[in-house]
């Protein structure tokens, strides 16, 4: 029997500064993966996390 999908989803958080910032420490776009509860958080997540490419704490938005 196939099991039902759980409430938790795996999402990807992407740095918003990496797309526009040209003065970066290294090229590329930083992404984090995390999970969220589908029932408690229905909207898109925005978290402030460290970006090694920008070398600062920046806002990371949910993309998937």
UniProtKB/Swiss-Prot annotation:
User: Which InterPro entries does the protein's record reference?
Assistant: Ribosomal_bL33, Ribosomal_bL33_CS, Ribosomal_bL33_sf, Ribosomal_zn-bd
HAMAP family named among the record's database cross-references? Ribosomal_bL33 (MF_00294)
Q: List UniProt keywords, sorted A-Z.
A: Ribonucleoprotein, Ribosomal protein
Q: Which NCBIfam families does the entry mention?
A: PRK00504.1, PRK00595.1, rpmG_bact
Q: What is this protein called?
A: Large ribosomal subunit protein bL33
As one GO molecular function, the record gives: structural constituent of ribosome
Q: Read off the PROSITE patterns from this record.
A: RIBOSOMAL_L33
What is the primary gene name for this protein? rpmG
